[in-house]
């Protein structure tokens, strides 16, 4: 039977990734989350902007101690762009990568190679990002106690974002002279996000004297508003069925 909702499709994407069938997974992802030149409030779109010298922009980030970068979990391009930032930012002393989906094994300490494990590492581009960091002597930290919130039956979103910020704060305070890149999904890295207080805002509240910047690299990736039409496209044109 045809897919009835997006959860069924996301479940299939997860299964394909677990089986190593990344080509089929990517085909579905690229149909479900198409790129679109989204309009801004002033009526402009991405097509109206002129190219910039990215090296000049990266130099401006040198004044910050913490850079928050968000990931679009089902859109692999966001990992490539983050890898690009990582490559340049390490030259400015950002030698600590804190990643979502990886739980810390030892409190406040960088993970050893054999300790790096997590759900998103099943996706090749996420693994590529972590592999690059390890090979370039960038410390990997986990900060995500996702399942702790589920097991305690708390408000999962509020619990998770606040706990992420608590763990990041602890890592930063133990390494006060270091610089950090925090890689988190979707709106977790924002300062405000609809009616949810995200990790980025908690972190700013917890570290008021620390210079923090949030880079939203996903603004022009078409998001949830277009997913229902994408669902129809998947069912009608690709003839996809549930397992």
What kind of region is each of these model predictions?
Residues 1-243:
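Compositional signal for N-terminal targeting/processing segments
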């Amino acid at each position: 039977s045809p897919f009835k909702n997006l959860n069924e499709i996301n479940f299939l994407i997860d299964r394909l990734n677990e089986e190593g069938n990344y080509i089929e997974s990517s085909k579905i992802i690229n149909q479900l989350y198409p790129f679109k030149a989204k309009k801004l409030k002033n009526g402009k779109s991405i097509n109206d902007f002129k190219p910039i010298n990215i090296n000049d922009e990266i130099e401006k980030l040198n004044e910050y101690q913490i850079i928050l970068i968000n990931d679009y979990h089902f859109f692999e391009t966001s990992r490539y762009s983050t890898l690009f930032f990582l490559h340049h930012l390490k030259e400015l002393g950002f030698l600590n990568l804190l990643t979502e989906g990886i739980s810390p094994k030892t409190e406040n300490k960088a993970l050893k190679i054999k300790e790096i494990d997590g759900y998103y590492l099943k996706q090749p581009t996420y693994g590529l990002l972590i592999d690059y960091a390890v090979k370039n002597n960038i410390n990997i930290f986990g900060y995500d106690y996702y399942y702790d919130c589920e097991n305690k039956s708390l408000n999962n979103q509020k619990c998770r974002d606040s706990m992420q910020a608590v763990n990041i704060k602890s890592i930063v305070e133990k390494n006060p002279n270091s610089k950090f890149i925090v890689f988190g999904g979707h709106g977790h890295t924002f300062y405000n996000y609809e009616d949810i207080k995200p990790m980025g805002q908690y972190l700013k509240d917890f570290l008021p004297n620390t210079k923090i910047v949030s880079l939203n690299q996903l603004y022009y990736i078409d998001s949830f508003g277009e997913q229902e039409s994408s669902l129809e496209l998947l069912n009608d044109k690709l003839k996809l069925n549930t397992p």
